[in-house]
Amino acid sequence: MDKIIIRGGKRLSGAVPVSGAKNSALTLLPCALLTDEPVTLRNLPRLADIDGFQHLMNQFGVSTSIAGARPEDFGRVMTLQATRLTSTVAPYDLVRKMRASILVLGPMLARAGEATVSLPGGCAIGNRPIDLHLKALEALGAQIELAAGYVRAIAPDGGLPGGRYSFPVVSVGATENALMAAVLAKGKSTLHNAAREPEIVDLCNLLVAMGAQIEGIGTSDLTIHGVDRLHGATYMVMPDRIEAGSYACAAAITGGEVMLNGARIEDMEATVQALRDAGVHVEPRKGGIYVAADGPLKPVTISTAPYPGFATDMQAQLMAMLCLAHGSSVLTETIFENRYMHVPELNRMGARIETKGRTAVVHGVEKLTGAEVMATDLRASMSLVIAGLAAEGETQVHRLYHLDRGYERLEEKLSLLGAEIERVGGD
């Protein structure tokens, strides 16, 4: 099994391209199920999860073609066409590796009148139930059945009538599934307390480009007027705000300066504020975001929250950066339980982090030291890389399949910035 070896202590400097957003791409891909015309997505990141979702779409009879497949390219262009659906079942062997597979439920139901999806796996971060997905689809008129590890959704004869649903808690995935189901419903649908993440806006913008009628984009109250059919579209995937924030933390912990080409500061204001509070200089520049750290890092107190709050997907990376802050930082995780699995690994590198329930206290230390560490999930694995970049000596990060799910060609990008990092085959 591959591992990454980092020889730390190098100051990061230079420019790095920010890839298309993984969390957006995995929502845009299933939109191809909503039309028999071609949907072309540009700036699609090269990631294991994207490849897995492509295989899932092929399972339904969706044709896919890829341009920009040269080894030196960042990003790709994929065209998907669901001329005729040959299956409405997402089987266990494809779904188990990737939670995002549940996002085919809404669009498949809207297009075909039924959908059967294996209950998802693919994530070790606490309990991520899909009950809100199912309740939202029921509110739009679907009949839901659960049996033998599968969920089956069935629309009434004539299609989904549409309806009204108020999310008891904000759910990004459930908002996405409900949106994709509602755009082809026979009537009007309203979604209250909907998620407002930039990735939701990206989804809405693609659906509108395909002919959907959606009001309230970017707010927590969405109104969808169902249409008879959607057409194809060509769309550019938004830049990955989590990847951009991760590289910003890497620049900061090494006392470096980095230009994040393609990043949009308006998508990541909470992350930018946290970095500024920690003493990092962040400013928008033409074509991206400039990040520089030329002084000591300061401790911060922060809680994760739904957008526009601080993203849970940035918690581990910020924590790694704060290991070298001058003072004690307090991080509270309000979105997912069990999202501190990186803490023991960071402590192996000399960090001083204490956890109690959903709160972690990070006592800044003078230095980190290289060690062999093991990734436990996607963002935790990036936190170990960030720590390794600043650590004295050599750090080896194992279980790279987590990183490959969410960071396009990580070692190449960090090498562009001067990091001494390589991927090698494991024992």
Curated annotation (Swiss-Prot):
GO MF terms held by the record: UDP-N-acetylglucosamine 1-carboxyvinyltransferase activity
Keyword check for Cytoplasm, yes or no.
Answer: yes
Single Gene Ontology BP annotation: peptidoglycan biosynthetic process
Look up the EC number in the record and give it. Answer: 2.5.1.7
The catalysed reaction is: phosphoenolpyruvate + UDP-N-acetyl-alpha-D-glucosamine = UDP-N-acetyl-3-O-(1-carboxyvinyl)-alpha-D-glucosamine + phosphate
The residues listed in the UniProt record as binding phosphoenolpyruvate, with positions renumbered to this chain, are K22, N23
Q: Which cysteines are joined by disulfide bonds?
A: none
Top-level taxon: Bacteria
Query: PTM 2-(S-cysteinyl)pyruvic acid O-phosphothioketal: at which residues?
Result: C123
Q: Which GO terms describe its cellular component?
A: cytoplasm
* Major subcellular location class: cytoplasm
Which EC main class describes this enzyme?
Answer: transferase
Q: In which pathway does it act?
A: Cell wall biogenesis; peptidoglycan biosynthesis
Instruction: Keywords in alphabetical order, please.
Output: Cell cycle, Cell division, Cell shape, Cell wall biogenesis/degradation, Cytoplasm, Peptidoglycan synthesis, Pyruvate, Transferase
**Record bears the keyword Plastid:** no
Query: Which of this chain's residues are annotated to bind UDP-N-acetyl-alpha-D-glucosamine?
Result: R99, R128, P129, I130, D131, L132, D313, I335
Q: What biological function has been recorded for the protein in this entry?
A: Cell wall formation. Adds enolpyruvyl to UDP-N-acetylglucosamine.
UniProt-listed PANTHER family? UDP-N-ACETYLGLUCOSAMINE 1-CARBOXYVINYLTRANSFERASE
Q: Which family does it belong to?
A: Belongs to the EPSP synthase family. MurA subfamily.
Question: Which named protein is this?
Answer: UDP-N-acetylglucosamine 1-carboxyvinyltransferase
**Species for this entry:** Novosphingobium aromaticivorans (strain ATCC 700278 / DSM 12444 / CCUG 56034 / CIP 105152 / NBRC 16084 / F199)
- Provide the organism lineage as a comma list: Bacteria, Pseudomonadati, Pseudomonadota, Alphaproteobacteria, Sphingomonadales
* Name of the gene: murA
